[in-house]
Amino acid sequence: MLDAFGKVVAQADARGEFISSAQFDALSKLASEGNKRLDAVQGITASAATIVSSAARSLFAEQPQLIAPGGNAYTNRRVAACLRDLEIVLRYITYATLAGDSSVLDDRCLNGLRETYQALGVPGSSVAVAIQKMKDAAVSVVNDPSGVTVGDCSALASEVASYFDRAAAAVV
């Protein structure tokens, strides 16, 4: 896992070059907006239980067959496993947001997840719907102006949304 800074250094080192001015500018921007990033991660983390439970509740309301007898989330144990998995995805998205790079999400959470779900008979499309619901809630947290560093958070909100999109695509 590399953060955005480590990745730039590794790339420049592999090429045997100094860090380019464009790379330096991108890292400088990332550093200058660090407080927004910290505020976003703190907000998502503080709201994590609500984000996860609301996404699951909404998914089960839209797809009641999942919690009906014979459904993939039938029994409390399976619902708990669903909530746990959604929480893990959300947690790794906060790590990626903090690092400014998706590699931790990809390497430690998403790689092999589709195959695992297929082997267990978990409907990936339903998981993707729940992840999209979490995305909507998390992006709302990022865009909430209360208690965050003043400034435009649209680029950061787009970045956070892209991590959710990446996770949703990984399970279908």
Curated annotation (Swiss-Prot):
Cellular localization per UniProt: Plastid, Cyanelle thylakoid membrane
Post-translational modifications: Contains two covalently linked phycocyanobilin chromophores.
Claim: Methyltransferase is one of the keywords in the record: no
Binding site for (2R,3E)-phycocyanobilin 2: 153
Residues bearing the modification N4-methylasparagine: 72
InterPro entries: Globin-like_sf, Phycobilisome_asu/bsu, Phycobilisome_asu/bsu_sf, Phycocyanin_b
Gene Ontology CC terms: cyanelle thylakoid membrane; phycobilisome
Main location (coarse class): plastid
SUPFAM superfamilies noted in UniProt: Globin-like (SSF46458)
One example of a Gene Ontology biological process annotation: photosynthesis
Homology family: Belongs to the phycobiliprotein family.
Function: Light-harvesting photosynthetic bile pigment-protein from the phycobiliprotein complex (phycobilisome, PBS). Phycocyanin is the major phycobiliprotein in the PBS rod.
Subunit structure: Heterodimer of an alpha and a beta subunit, which further assembles into trimers and the trimers into hexamers. The basic functional unit of phycobiliproteins is a ring-shaped hexamer formed from two back-to-back trimers contacting via the alpha chain subunits. The trimers are composed of alpha/beta subunit heterodimers arranged around a three-fold axis of symmetry. The phycoerythrins also contain a gamma subunit which is located in the center of the hexamer.
Protein name (Swiss-Prot/TrEMBL): C-phycocyanin beta chain
The organism of origin for this protein: Cyanophora paradoxa
Protein encoded by which gene: cpcB
